[in-house]
Amino acid sequence: MYYIGIDVSKKDLAVFDGKKDLEFINQEGLKSFKKYLKKKYHLQEVAIIFEPTGVYSLYLKEFCAENSIKAYIVNPKKSHNFTRALGKRSKTDKIDARILYQFHKLIDLKDIKVPQIDQEAKTLASYLTSYEFALKQRVSLSHHYRESAR
């Protein structure tokens, strides 16, 4: 089994494969990441370790599900405690990816599975994102209206 630690952010995936630090764009389909994986590994032999970061980690979770890639989604509290136990203080995406990679030493193999995508939860998350955007726009327009009325 080949382990890959990934720190997920809005724009990028910071990846550590045990040897190299890499970076890929976090976008639907993750084409460049898939190309890298196929070139270097058999997808069935890979286990991806990452923390859930809400909407930002959804592309990665879907990618794993669609390509039958095993993943271990780390509870953020466990990851935080593991980082403290290692004595790491500096928080960069590269360091986080390396720490998530090291987390594989604590994982029971039976807990590494291909993620399942709940379509209803995905739809609700999309609605929630749209609603939050509409609220921000309303507040912004309200402030703009008040300023122009003065």
Task: Locate the predicted segments by residue.
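Nucleic-acid-processing active sites and adjacent nucleic-acid-binding tracks
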Residues: 18-47
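Short, well-ordered alpha-helical microsegments
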Residues: 56-61, 111
